[in-house]
Structure formats: C-alpha cells, structure tokens
C-alpha cells in the first residue's frame, strides 16, 4: 500500500524536497491541497493538481509530471497536461481546454483554445490560435501564431509550419509548400512515390449552383501546341528516393512560360514556394477536351470536302 504523508506549509505550492520522500510515496500539501510523488528518477512531480507557481485557482485543470503546467494562471482553465514540461508556460495567457501529453508538449504555448498535442515537443511554441491537433514527436513544433484548425499526424508532420493555418499534414515529415502556406492537404513527404486508393480520381465540388460567369474555355488546340511534354530523370536537390528514376511529364518553368499572362486563369503551377515549384497537370484536362473537339471539327471538315 502506498504511504501518504502530509507536508504542512504556510506557503501555497511549496514542493516537498526529494530527500523527504521515498520513491512511490505521496505527499499532500495541506495548505493548497496539492499532491506530489517521487518518480523512478528521483524527481518530485505533481499528481492530479497543477504544479502552479503563480495561481492555485486554475479551474478544472489536471497536471501530471515534473513542471507540467508549472506557471499556469487563473485564466487557464479546463486543461490536461501530462508529461514533464507539458503546458509549462501558461501564465498570463488565457489558454483553455487544451490536452498536452508528452515531454514538453505545448511547453512554450501561452494563448489559445482547444489544442490537442500528443508527443514530445508537439505544438511546442503555438500561441494565439485555436483547435490544432498534433500527434507524434515534433509535430507542429515550430508553429507560433499559425496552426489554426490544423491537423498534423506523424513524426515531424507540420514541423516546418510557422504561421500557416488550416493545413492537414499526414505522414512522417509531411509539410505544406512553405512555412506560411495555408489551406493545404499534404500526404507524406518528398520520398513518397505512390498514392494508393481503390479509386483513380479525387472527386471535387463542381455544382453549377456554386459557379457564375460560365463560358466556353478560350484555351484549346493552340495552347496545347505550345506545351512541351518531356522525359526526364529525377536529380532532386534534397536527394530523395526518386533520384535516378525516369518519368514523363512537364517542367513547371515551361508551363509558366506557356501560360504567360494567363497563368492565374490556367493555374498550372503552384508558385507559393519559389524554391520548389509544383505543377498541376490535371488542370489541363478541360483544355485537352477542347483541343480534341477542335481537331474533330477539322477532321470532319476535311472529310466533307
């Protein structure tokens, strides 16, 4: 049976000395009703109530671990911090309804509502945003004023994000185009070479009731003839698994040149990160259909003559 001893103190949040406890013993501070124990490493940790050096009245908050919720203030309510350093910096801030589990999870966070951080350093620096979910070591570790309503799943997922919001990153080291990118969904990192599913296309919104100024596309055969389909061998600057592989496709810079002043309408290249251009060849499908229609008309005209 675990022995419970009492530590009488006139100072709220006074912590028992490690030498006063045997491993596994519980110590109760009768002044502020905080409970402590000594872990296997010889450190004194709080159990069930916040280890609070600023205010003992944070409502409905539970902490477990050395310095978990260490500086929690009176406006930081309904939080759960489990693990050494988890949620340690909530003091003057108004963070509430957070769950941080793991060493230094949300350790430097101060403001916000409803974050879930599971894993060492998960959402370490996040402040001023709400409702981010990060599961895995170092997920969203560099988010500062970003991460709003984002989901990071897998070690280092979203680790490069700083101010970007409403991103979804799934898989090891998966990240958006840039640290400030928002509204992106990223599956895996740059070494992923196959996207497998039981269907071959992604269904997107195309309802006429959600569109206006509908006209026939002005782009067709003439534009298609300006494109340069290429064969190339990958030699990535970051040295990933695709290096040496031969593929067919387009060059982003050549697509931009073909689009000219109409690149915004055609949306063939994502330029958000100028150091890593990304092509959306699928946006050529409507133009290819128009080109086929124009060719069909030419063939029919020749046949009729």
Where are these regions (language model features)?
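Glycine-rich, low-complexity segments
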Residues: 1-13, 37-71, 160, 191-216, ...
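Short, polar loop/linker segments at the starts of domains and inter-domain junctions
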Residues: 14-22, 80, 241-248
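Short hydrophobic/aromatic-rich beta-strand motifs
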Residues: 19-37
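Acidic glycine-/aspartate-rich tracts in secreted/extracellular proteins
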Residues: 32-33, 40-42, 261-262
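Short polybasic amphipathic segments
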Residues: 35-37, 185, 195, 232, ...
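Glycine- and small/polar-enriched repetitive beta-structure motifs of secreted/surface proteins
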Residues: 49-206
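Intramolecular chaperone/auto-protease modules of tailspike-like proteins
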Residues: 205-305
């Amino acid at each position: 049976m675990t022995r419970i001893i009492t530590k009488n103190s006139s100072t709220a949040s006074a912590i028992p000395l490690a030498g006063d406890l045997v491993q596994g013993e519980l110590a109760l501070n009768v002044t502020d009703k905080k409970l402590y124990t000594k872990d296997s490493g010889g450190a004194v940790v709080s159990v069930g109530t916040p280890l609070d050096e600023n205010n003992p009245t944070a409502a409905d908050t539970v902490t477990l671990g050395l310095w978990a919720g260490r500086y929690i203030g009176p406006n930081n309510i309904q939080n759960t911090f489990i693990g050494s350093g988890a949620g340690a910096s909530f003091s003057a801030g108004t963070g509430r309804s957070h769950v941080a589990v793991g060493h230094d999870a949300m350790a430097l966070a101060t403001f916000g509502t409803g974050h879930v951080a599971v894993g060492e350093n998960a959402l370490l620096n996040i402040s001023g945003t709400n409702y981010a979910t990060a599961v895995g070591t170092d997920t969203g570790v560099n988010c500062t004023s970003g991460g709003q309503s984002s989901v990071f799943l897998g070690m280092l997922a979203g680790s490069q994000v700083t101010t970007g919001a409403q991103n979804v990153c799934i898989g090891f080291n998966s990240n958006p185009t840039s640290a400030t990118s928002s509204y992106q969904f990223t599956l895996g990192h740059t070494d992923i070479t196959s996207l497998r599913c039981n269907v071959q296309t992604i269904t997107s919104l195309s309802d006429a009731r959600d569109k206006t100024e509908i006209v026939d596309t002005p782009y067709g055969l003439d534009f298609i003839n300006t494109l340069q389909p290429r064969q190339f061998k990958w030699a990535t600057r970051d040295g990933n698994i695709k290096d040496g592989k031969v593929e067919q496709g387009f060059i982003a810079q050549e697509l931009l040149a073909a689009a000219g002043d109409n690149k915004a309408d055609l949306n063939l290249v994502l330029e958000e990160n100028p150091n890593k251009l990304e092509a959306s060849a699928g946006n050529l499908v409507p133009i290819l259909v128009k080109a086929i229609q124009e060719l069909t008309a030419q063939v029919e005209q020749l046949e009729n003559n």
